[in-house]
């Protein structure tokens, strides 16, 4: 094909680490050749990831979101392929509001 594959599965669950968390939600995100998948904002999430060069750690917290300090950790995992390179990513957030405040749409599922 003319494009490198970008197909990801993102999961979210409550707990401290992916090793011990049961995924409560899972969505798919395909970004090539066009944006698709069960991610609720696939088009925007693909554009956001392209802007970040596929680097999930580059998705930083937005200043316009106020979250409580409540500690109810959630773990997000991302596995699959981004522009032909294997991806395996895990990040723990203090609570779901904090998770949703990183980046714009990638983690909001």
UniProtKB/Swiss-Prot annotation:
Q: Describe its function.
A: Inhibits plasmin, trypsin, subtilisin, and other microbial alkaline proteases.
- Note the InterPro entries from the entry: Prot_inh_I16_SSI, Prot_inh_SSI_I16_CS, Subtilisin_inhibitor, Subtilisin_inhibitor-like_sf
Residues that span the membrane, as ranges: none
The organism encoding this protein is: Streptomyces antifibrinolyticus
Q: What is this protein called?
A: Plasminostreptin
Gene Ontology molecular function: any one: serine-type endopeptidase inhibitor activity
Mainly resides where?
secreted
Q: Which GO terms describe its cellular component?
A: extracellular region
Would you say which domain of life the source belongs to?
Bacteria
Q: Where is this site: Reactive bond?
A: 69-70
Keywords, A to Z, come to: Disulfide bond, Protease inhibitor, Secreted, Serine protease inhibitor
Q: Which residues form a coiled coil?
A: none
| Listed HAMAP family | SSI
Which cysteine-cysteine pairs are annotated as disulfide bonds in the entry?
31-46, 67-97
Q: Where in the cell is it found?
A: Secreted
Which SUPFAM superfamilies does the record match to this protein? Subtilisin inhibitor
Q: Which family does it belong to?
A: Belongs to the protease inhibitor I16 (SSI) family.
What Pfam families does the database record attribute to this sequence? Answer: SSI (PF00720)
Q: How does it assemble?
A: Homodimer.
């Amino acid at each position: 094909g003319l494009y490198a594959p970008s197909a990801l599965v993102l999961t979210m669950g409550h707990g401290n680490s992916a090793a011990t968390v049961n995924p409560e939600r899972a969505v798919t995100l395909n970004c090539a050749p066009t944006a698709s998948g069960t991610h609720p904002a696939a088009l925007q999430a693909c554009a956001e990831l392209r802007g970040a060069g596929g680097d999930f750690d580059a998705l930083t917290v937005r200043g316009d979101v106020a979250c409580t300090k409540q500690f109810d950790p959630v773990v997000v995992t991302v596995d699959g392929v981004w522009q032909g390179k294997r991806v395996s990513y895990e990040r723990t957030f203090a609570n779901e509001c904090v998770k949703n405040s990183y980046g714009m749409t990638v983690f909001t599922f």
